[in-house]
Amino acid sequence: MFIALVPTTGWWDQHVWRQKEVHSFLATDERIVRPAADGGEVAVINLAGELFMNTGMSPFRIVDRLVDEAEALADAIVVDLHAEATSEKVAMGHYLDGRVTAVLGTHTHVQTSDARVLPGGTAYMTDVGMTGPLESVIGVRTDIIVKRFLTELPAQFEVADGPVRLDAALITAEGGRATGIEAFKVLL
């Protein structure tokens, strides 16, 4: 059994990648998971969904090649599918069942209650959730988001203050196949 802490950052045009002040850190720190990155004994494949994401490419078209490459490098393969559509995440879980250790959805910031091991031995969860302010609208100050909905005008997002919650999934595996998955959250 092994333990891997795998923080991911989302797709290129969102979240951390828009923050110019961290670009030099992102360019030099090898611990940061980037799209289609892998490392060590645990390979992490970071894919962006196509539906409602404007990526211009289906993750289904590239994932087979990436899984084949990762199998040669790692004992376990975790797929992070950063996607909006639940259907796309569920389909990817079934498509990769038995070929990867886990398929974990990200992007919607709300932890789902469907963590399970699929029949072929792949741990699956539609969305792991977020690490961010508890009293917020998916991490952003609530007043900004409410005003945006009321006025229908763009607004500069600001991270909310206050207690932080960490959403995560604990996966146990043997021989590259999941034996369990447990969703959890911690208030920090």
For each feature predicted by the language model, list its residue ranges:
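Acidic, metal/ion-coordinating pockets
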Residues: 1-188
